[in-house]
């Protein structure tokens, strides 16, 4: 029986970059005889326009039945004025929570060909390879109660809640330790245990889980210091594990150490490694339709999908090698362009990766 992959291009540049990723996926499917079948649907603003909601029930059901989901990006100014509960981003939060995608893996890798693209000195970032493991379905983004109320005198007050259960922390900690075990055997847990009760529990549980991983070196760091250390000396980190909000912020910061968020993929996994894969960048509505968006993060998300959800490491490595070969050829989209290289658009970059993959 064939494996089912649901394609959700989303909004903004999503359809453009997804078209290139699908070309690469289809070639890998044929080249490595993977037996995938692809289905397409809508999410985010595109779903609001079609169904009136950011994630239709039938789309969610298709995602549940699929073996993996490949997503582009959601959101845009067109939908900024509608009710908060039905904005495009709510579709993304809903599909993550409903599919139980609690573990978000966000690599920050500096390709040697792009060393000049980083805003930091080459000696600080050269060879950078960090993996941030972010808890994705708990914490302040999902906590209740939340809302607004009116205080005496008519002043408005807004409030959110940051809850974490022991089981939520334990399962994401295990993912962090498992990833560290097959990499550099170093795990840094990031929290704010000097202030937050949820972080105090987080640290206690991570320490307990560490007993099962004596071969992994565990350290703890407050989130404010971690944000500073990522800029000061990022290569001290191998795998970082942290909560939903801290991970959201730190992974975006880490991505810019590499020179372009347009290069970075991500994976969101459930307990069985079934997952949703998407680029780290957003929908970039300011360049949508111009044909200049960088498709490499989405193409590399295909590679992550093959590795983590389908255990197809040979196909994953081939895609990564194809991307590296294209960079060796000096092809660059505008976001990673530097003197001496050739600037190309979205489609030409995708075609180049396809050609490189075909010739491997």
From Swiss-Prot:
Q: Which residues bind Mg(2+)?
A: 224, 248, 252
Residues annotated as binding substrate: 96, 106, 134, 224
- Which enzyme type, at the first EC level? oxidoreductase
A GO term for molecular function: magnesium ion binding
UniProt keyword annotations, A-Z:
Amino-acid biosynthesis, Branched-chain amino acid biosynthesis, Cytoplasm, Leucine biosynthesis, Magnesium, Manganese, Metal-binding, NAD, Oxidoreductase
Q: How is the cofactor bound?
A: Binds 1 Mg(2+) or Mn(2+) ion per subunit.
Site (Important for catalysis) found at: 141, 192
Alphabetical GO CC annotations of the entry are: cytosol
Tell me which residues bind NAD(+): 76-89, 282-294
A biological process (GO) of this protein is: L-leucine biosynthetic process
According to its UniProt record, where is this protein located?
Cytoplasm
Q: What is its EC number?
A: 1.1.1.85
One Pfam family here:
Iso_dh
The main place the protein resides is: cytoplasm
Please list the reactions this protein catalyses: (2R,3S)-3-isopropylmalate + NAD(+) = 4-methyl-2-oxopentanoate + CO2 + NADH
Q: Which cofactor does it need?
A: Mg(2+); Mn(2+)
User: What function is annotated for this protein?
Assistant: Catalyzes the oxidation of 3-carboxy-2-hydroxy-4-methylpentanoate (3-isopropylmalate) to 3-carboxy-4-methyl-2-oxopentanoate. The product decarboxylates to 4-methyl-2 oxopentanoate.
Q: How does this protein assemble? A: Homodimer.
Indicate the family of this protein: Belongs to the isocitrate and isopropylmalate dehydrogenases family. LeuB type 1 subfamily.
In its UniProt entry, what is this protein called?
Answer: 3-isopropylmalate dehydrogenase
- The record lists the organism as Pseudomonas putida (strain ATCC 47054 / DSM 6125 / CFBP 8728 / NCIMB 11950 / KT2440)
Taxonomy of the source species: Bacteria, Pseudomonadati, Pseudomonadota, Gammaproteobacteria, Pseudomonadales
